[in-house]
Amino acid sequence: MKIDSTTKVFGLIGHPVKHSLSPLIHNSSFEKLNFNGVYVVFDVAPELLENAVKGLKALGIKGFNVTVPHKESVMNYLDFVTEEAEKIGAVNTVVNENGILKGYNTDVQGFIDSLKELKEDVRGRKAFVLGAGGASKAICFALAREGVESIVIANRTLNKAKALAEYIREEFKMKCDYCSIEEVEKFNEIDILINTTSVGMHPEVGNSPVSEEVVAKANFVYDLIYNPSETLFLKYARKNGVKSANGLSMLVNQASYAFYLWTGEFFDKDFVYEKIRGEM
């Protein structure tokens, strides 16, 4: 990779970000396509988000991804947000078009494409979603679009779960309930169980958002976390013979849409998966 005075700079803002595979994905793809770009990470504490976004804009950063905990709050500091991202209430990709910061959400389609790669048909099924933040909003939208019968949103902060459940009910005219994380234990039947929280990510690798007993009830378990590749949540699934997947395919698929927004080209997903396997 050659960096010169015309190199376009892209990046990721979040807190933490040192676990991220996004630099590997984008930098290897820039190189493969002979695109003069570089992708770096910026660890931005919540109280510094506004200043960080202003700084990225002032420096002419061409685009950036947004990860936890900024997917919702970053919307306050953008010049434009797409209708879909506005509806979802979360942005994960920003394009700088001549000083105008435009926010997009590629998580929804990234998750849908991930389900297709996994050959997991969710139509008519019941889903439990752990967490009610920006990632959860995208997952709930994706599940609703793909035709699940119902969604239960479980979150430590009940009012966030309630607000999201009410919004999904209204937007999609479907059954969507909410409960606390602890109350998930009381459900006897859990078909699809999805973790959108950061519990299990470094440095909380010894924790799971729910108990092994809850995971064992599920038919399919999905963890948006991809590093570590097998969280305790997913270890519970493997131990109990439950089909499961981590968030790697969602990461790659949403990244391919972000890459397209920045460059006008999709990257080679097979090449990217090969690169990741080489690193992990």
Curated annotation (Swiss-Prot):
Pathway(s) per entry: Metabolic intermediate biosynthesis; chorismate biosynthesis; chorismate from D-erythrose 4-phosphate and phosphoenolpyruvate: step 4/7
Active site: K71 (proton acceptor)
UniProt keyword Transcription, yes or no: no
Enzyme class: oxidoreductase
Keyword terms, alphabetized: Amino-acid biosynthesis, Aromatic amino acid biosynthesis, NADP, Oxidoreductase
Cited Pfam families: SDH_C (PF18317), Shikimate_DH (PF01488), Shikimate_dh_N (PF08501)
Entry binding sites for shikimate: S20, L21, S22, T67, N92, D107, Y226
Organism: Caldanaerobacter subterraneus subsp. tengcongensis (strain DSM 15242 / JCM 11007 / NBRC 100824 / MB4) (Thermoanaerobacter tengcongensis)
Subunit (UniProt): Homodimer.
GO biological process annotation, one example: shikimate metabolic process
Record's signal peptide: none
Spans through the membrane: none
InterPro entries: Aminoacid_DH-like_N_sf, NAD(P)-bd_dom_sf, SDH_C, Shikimate_DH, Shikimate_DH-bd_N, Shikimate_DH_fam, Shikm_DH/Glu-tRNA_Rdtase
UniProt similarity note: Belongs to the shikimate dehydrogenase family.
GO terms of molecular function: NADP binding; shikimate 3-dehydrogenase (NADP+) activity
Function text: Involved in the biosynthesis of the chorismate, which leads to the biosynthesis of aromatic amino acids. Catalyzes the reversible NADPH linked reduction of 3-dehydroshikimate (DHSA) to yield shikimate (SA).
Catalytic reactions of this protein: shikimate + NADP(+) = 3-dehydroshikimate + NADPH + H(+)
EC number(s) reported in the record: 1.1.1.25
Binding-site residues, NADP(+): E83, G131, A132, G133, G134, A135, N155, R156, T157, L158, N159, K160, L224, G247
Taxonomy, superkingdom: Bacteria
Designated name of the protein: Shikimate dehydrogenase (NADP(+))
